């Protein structure tokens, strides 16, 4: 037994999670490279507003790694691709939006959730920049703020163009634009995209029945510098669909080869260490802790 565990620890880096009772059940095996869940009870998605569904999972990422929270079910329900920052200690929550004007009931077994790990770069910003550094220590996302007021009409798609070049250029890392969980929880979704060239084109959708106003200077989205290995370029797209199981909206996505381990089933680690840093100290106020939804907070 001890020899098997020793061999396991030499094979891959490990991410520990804790599962508490919820309407979701973990379906992936111990040490798999993805954490997968499925609903064990019906989930109701309301129209004209976002539904925030707790998953009953607490996850501790490794230093230098963050995670993506992806989900899929019926086509008339969309999900916010959630960025789980390394120091986020709160319960993972899924933000759902309904494309119809009626309640959607997702029966048990039809809402599938996947958590994937990836590596990212935390560049140092020198001088004035269109990006703001992460709010909390070790966060992955850099904030992009509006230089003008923006209004998104109810139940409408809106495309917003910014004549901006990404201030950080890297051969090995790609700037990826993600929506903020705070806005997603209010009903405004942003389609993930790569930031290329000198124009940033953002696609948004207001799922609510009211106009959403974004004041000048407010945080619109976040930029994460993902390693190129996670974003393979495969053409044609139909081939990419066969080669890669996971997608970040339209982009094929490859996860890091880590092992997700249920800390309550692992004899090597105590549950008391899940919310401590590597020195054994409790998480400080400078880190995210349980603030927000694991992304930019609400």
Curated annotation (Swiss-Prot):
Catalytic activity: dUTP + H2O = dUMP + diphosphate + H(+)
Required cofactor names: Mg(2+)
Keyword terms, alphabetized: Hydrolase, Magnesium, Metal-binding, Nucleotide metabolism
Record's signal peptide: none
GO biological process terms on file: dUTP metabolic process
Residues binding substrate, per UniProt: 180-182
EC number: 3.6.1.23
Class of this enzyme: hydrolase
GO MF terms held by the record: dUTP diphosphatase activity; metal ion binding
UniProt superkingdom: Viruses
Pfam families to which the protein is assigned, alphabetical: dUTPase
Listed HAMAP family: HSV_DUT (MF_04031)
Purpose: Involved in nucleotide metabolism: produces dUMP, the immediate precursor of thymidine nucleotides and decreases the intracellular concentration of dUTP to avoid uracil incorporation into viral DNA.
Similarity section: Belongs to the dUTPase family.
Name of the molecule in the record: Deoxyuridine 5'-triphosphate nucleotidohydrolase
